[in-house]
């Protein structure tokens, strides 16, 4: 993995998050370089700037390298982006004092004079972000959007004009272009959440714009709903919860359980919270909060005493636009570490991802619960053995380059 970022005289060391990933993926792309180069070429001054969708801090670190006190507002929906940016700033000895951190639903500051933005994969979410900016940007404010050249077309420029102001694209550099949009000062209506029903499970679902499966039940979730685990579970985690549908149905099946919804996307966590309230799933026979909602990097920051007896998991295999299996690895390892002895990890995934190999390595057991032509449901049980637990704990050592390194031996040089 390349970690040395170099453009227009700026030199940085940047890592993806978590930094122990063992992959060929790097923490930035050429569009990040193009945006920084554009600012330097145009001699941009250090005015109040919003940085939107900065994957792991390349843009933020670049700006602070130009001026350590550049006033910045950082917007992201991904907790791993926030954590990765913070780590990279610390790694490069750049102060965070001039930064205001916001998620994609927080109120934006009224004084923004420039916007730097990376084009996200989800164009509905992109439109939502442009609509948000239209509420705070005065007419004439410049918005610079970095993207792969192949992603930029007439339709995209029309979308930008419709939601914020007229836009044009630069010449291509390293297969990327910078779109310059000039805000027209007209506030657009913010999009409403998409709502739909799952009548066979008597559930109503509401999705915000950056949540997977925006307006229908995805195939993986459906097979999972049809094949919930058997048992008597009291503490259940919906890990990578999305809109929360697995956890919602788990509460229907196990009404005595407390459900914990966790996702890297703040919009997903907010959608799960809304769906819990929408479906009125609290059991009057139980005391205390029956559902918790965490915007977090898997189970990283759960208290050490937290010991669920069931983890439901439909792992993503994308981080931004990158295809990677490290998220599944981290989910499985976190589940093993946190589950009580005898607890169950119940996983759905595409057959070609071969999750059974990973689960067998970590849990030393794996059972196929159900399958169809595309998906498979797997189940692994935590059977506590000191040597086995010690082996997995090594995978979380800060010196370990990748979550599965302790299971596979040393990474390749």
Swiss-Prot record:
Q: Which E.C. number(s) belong to this protein?
A: 2.1.1.174
Q: Could you tell me what reaction this enzyme catalyses? A: guanosine(1835) in 23S rRNA + S-adenosyl-L-methionine = N(2)-methylguanosine(1835) in 23S rRNA + S-adenosyl-L-homocysteine + H(+)
| Subcellular localization(s) per the UniProt record | Cytoplasm
- What Gene3D superfamilies does this protein map onto? Vaccinia Virus protein VP39 (3.40.50.150)
Top-rank taxon of the source lineage equals Bacteria
Pfam families (UniProt xref): MTS (PF05175)
Q: Which UniProt keywords apply?
A: Cytoplasm, Methyltransferase, rRNA processing, S-adenosyl-L-methionine, Transferase
Q: Name one GO molecular function term.
A: 23S rRNA (guanine(1835)-N(2))-methyltransferase activity
**Family annotation (InterPro entries):** DNA_methylase_N6_adenine_CS (IPR002052), rRNA_m2G-MeTrfase_RlmG (IPR017237), RsmC/RlmG (IPR046977), SAM-dependent_MTases_sf (IPR029063), Small_mtfrase_dom (IPR007848)
Region Disordered: start-end pairs: 389-413
What function does this protein fulfil?
A: Specifically methylates the guanine in position 1835 (m2G1835) of 23S rRNA.
**Name of the molecule in the record:** Ribosomal RNA large subunit methyltransferase G
Upper classification of the organism:
Bacteria, Pseudomonadati, Pseudomonadota, Gammaproteobacteria, Alteromonadales
């Amino acid at each position: 993995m390349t970690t040395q970022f170099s453009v227009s005289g700026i030199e940085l060391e940047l890592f993806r998050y978590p930094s122990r990933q063992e992959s060929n993926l790097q923490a930035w792309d050429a569009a990040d370089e193009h945006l920084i180069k554009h600012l330097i070429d145009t001699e941009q001054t250090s005015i109040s700037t919003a940085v939107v969708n900065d994957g792991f801090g390349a843009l933020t670190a670049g700006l602070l390298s130009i001026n350590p006190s550049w006033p910045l507002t950082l917007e992201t929906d991904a907790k791993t982006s926030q954590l990765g940016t913070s780590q990279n700033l610390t790694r490069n000895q750049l102060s965070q004092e001039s930064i205001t951190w916001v998620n994609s639903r927080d109120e934006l500051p009224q004084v923004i004079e420039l916007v730097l933005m990376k084009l996200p994969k989800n164009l509905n979410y992109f439109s939502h972000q442009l609509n948000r900016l239209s509420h705070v940007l005065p007419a004439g404010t410049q918005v610079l959007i970095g993207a792969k050249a192949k992603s930029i077309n007439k339709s995209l420029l029309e979308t930008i004009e419709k939601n914020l102001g007229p836009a044009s694209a630069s010449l291509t550099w390293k297969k990327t272009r910078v779109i310059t949009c000039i805000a027209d000062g007209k506030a657009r209506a913010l999009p409403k959440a998409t709502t739909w029903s799952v009548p066979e499970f008597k559930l109503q679902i509401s999705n915000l714009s950056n949540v997977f499966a925006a307006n229908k039940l995805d195939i993986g979730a459906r097979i999972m709903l049809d094949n919930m685990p058997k048992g008597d579970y009291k503490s259940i985690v919906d890990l990578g919860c999305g809109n929360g549908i697995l956890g919602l149905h788990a509460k229907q099946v196990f009404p005595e359980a407390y459900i914990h919804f966790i996702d890297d996307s703040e919009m997903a966590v907010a959608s799960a919270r809304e769906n819990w309230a929408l479906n009125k799933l609290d059991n009057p026979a139980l005391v205390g909060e029956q559902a918790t909602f965490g915007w977090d990097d898997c189970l990283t920051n759960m208290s050490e005493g937290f010991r669920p007896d069931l983890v439901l998991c439909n792992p993503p295999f994308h981080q931004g636009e990158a295809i990677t299996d490290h998220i599944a690895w981290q989910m499985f390892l976190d589940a093993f570490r946190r589950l009580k002895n005898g607890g169950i990890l119940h996983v759905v995934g595409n057959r070609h991802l071969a999750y059974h190999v990973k689960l067998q390595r970590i849990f030393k057991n794996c059972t196929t619960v159900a399958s169809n032509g595309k998906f498979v449901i797997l189940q692994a049980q935590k059977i506590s053995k000191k040597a086995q637990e010690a082996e997995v704990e090594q995978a979380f050592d800060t010196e370990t380059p990748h979550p599965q390194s302790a299971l596979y031996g040393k990474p390749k040089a």
